């Protein structure tokens, strides 16, 4: 069962909107994504957090959601190939306890690489983060991956790009991180 505080947290995330920022839990782009992408990403984040709520020992925080990772999965530092079972190290069972659902469109003319259309997006940072936690001896449900700016900042006019969050965006992100810590309780960061 999904914790009500997690649902409320995701609703809070969904309220954020800014220029040149994609919100995985509120926004969708039909050129790149399937129709019900927002609903799927919300469910995946709910499942991810609920599995870790009572077991997490660590909160690992990176900078921002990237276009090859959390943008399409709704989960920080977690790419589509991981939730679909195409990753060599991280399996869907480790993340969600079941196979996840991709939200990028296999038939998108805007996704240029055949491998991305076939197997979904793959983010190198995601592999590094997951591998580091697992190699440190943490079980997959003993850490929560998060971004200080949980949304995907992109360069103007270039949807599939990443940019560094502004100071204002980082400040907004800190508020969301505090909300997350209210749900999880105190965790080493």
Put a short name on every predicted segment.
Residues 2-188:
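A polyanion-binding, active-site-adjacent surface
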């Amino acid at each position: 069962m999904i914790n009500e505080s997690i649902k409320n947290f995701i609703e809070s995330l969904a309220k954020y909107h800014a220029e040149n920022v994609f919100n995985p839990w509120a926004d969708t782009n039909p050129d790149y994504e399937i129709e019900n992408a927002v609903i799927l990403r919300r469910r995946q984040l709910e499942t991810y957090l609920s599995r870790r709520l009572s077991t997490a020992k660590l909160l690992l925080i990176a900078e921002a959601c990237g276009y090859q990772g959390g943008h399409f999965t709704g989960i920080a530092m977690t790419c589509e190939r991981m939730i679909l079972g195409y990753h060599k190290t991280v399996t869907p069972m480790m993340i969600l306890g079941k196979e996840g659902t991709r939200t990028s469109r296999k038939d998108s003319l805007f996704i240029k690489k055949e491998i991305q259309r076939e197997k979904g997006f793959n983010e190198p940072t995601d592999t590094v983060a997951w591998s580091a936690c697992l190699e440190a001896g943490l079980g997959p449900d003993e850490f929560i991956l998060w971004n200080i700016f949980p949304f995907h900042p992109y360069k103007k006019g270039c949807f599939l790009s990443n940019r560094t969050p502004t100071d204002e965006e980082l400040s907004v992100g800190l508020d969301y991180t505090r909300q997350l810590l209210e749900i999880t309780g105190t965790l080493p960061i």
